[in-house]
Amino acid sequence: MNKITVLCVDDSALMRQIMREIINSHSDMEVVACAPDPLVARDLIKKHNPQVLTLDVEMPRMDGIDFLEKLMRLRPMPVVMISSLTAKGSEITLRALELGAVDFITKPQLGIREGMLAYSELIAEKIRTAAQAKLSVPIITPVSSAPLSFKPLLSSEKLIAVGASTGGTEAIKNLLQPLPVTSPALLITQHMPPGFTRSFAERLNKLSQITVKEAENGERILPGHAYIAPGDRHMELCRNGADYQVLITDAPAVNRHRPSVDVLFRSVAKFAGKNAVGVLLTGMGSDGAAGLLEMKQAGAYTLAQDEASCVVFGMPRAAIQMGAVDEVMDILKMSKRMLAKISSGQAVRI
């Protein structure tokens, strides 16, 4: 079996040593070289032709973002960013994902060695995912900057539930940007650690016509708003009389994820049923597939992103194989389609 070859770029000798230790402890991957900065990395990429690059966000001589931008333009390859758990770190990381990085790993703020070693399985999984990720997907911009037209719904019973993982930050951006302020509410679960979801929501809010925010426990769900599940918390739909409400919980991980897409979709199947549209986007694994099937069985219309526009086709593929998907389509056509489906049919009180 050929091992996944990895080049680690980090200005910290300790981090380079830890990453080498972690990666080499897995039988299906190995570190072929380490670089203290992007300028050294450039030569090592030519020499070793690694399959995956791990890249520190903040470095001297040339920072990770500048290097990533040049790399994705001149020599595209799968990149996993190593980021700090700070507001600045999360902003830079989201920019890196926009530029084409496949995923990111967060450095613990205290006890670097112990913290990183505890992430060993997660790091290995992200490297495996990166090695399989599709890089031919361009940085997508909506076909038209003009928002879609959508007649306001007479009922606030209608809503859209969205789930995503690897590659999802850009897919969600492309899903939300064309939506007009008259859109129904959206509940979105994107696999992401705490500290990043607020920055992600704020970034989307600046780019969208609708209001995008990190979800808060107990808040009323309103049309024209998108609610992002907070990192490391599950988000569910619930009811309070005639209104939909957000429920945020610390329940155990589902499918090894918190937030979990299945948790969101199952609650939407229960409380919204045929008033909902379910959307499953790019991501590794199968989280969301079973929940999407429950939504379909409850009468919801279900959509999955197609393989050609996915960074990783795992989650949509699992849902398709399970018979959970009504329609498979390109991410750029999905906004219009989900609005068309949500406006067809009468709202039914569940």
UniProtKB/Swiss-Prot annotation:
Subcellular localization: Cytoplasm
Post-translational modification: Phosphorylated by CheA. Phosphorylation of the N-terminal regulatory domain activates the methylesterase activity.
EC annotation from Swiss-Prot or TrEMBL: 3.1.1.61, 3.5.1.44
One Gene Ontology term, aspect cellular component: cytoplasm
Positions of the catalytic residues: S165, H191, D287
4-aspartylphosphate, modified sites: D56
UniProt KW Phosphoprotein keyword: yes
HAMAP family: CheB_chemtxs (MF_00099)
Protein family membership: Belongs to the CheB family.
Name recorded for this polypeptide: Protein-glutamate methylesterase/protein-glutamine glutaminase
UniProt source species: Photorhabdus laumondii subsp. laumondii (strain DSM 15139 / CIP 105565 / TT01) (Photorhabdus luminescens subsp. laumondii)
Gene name of this polypeptide: cheB
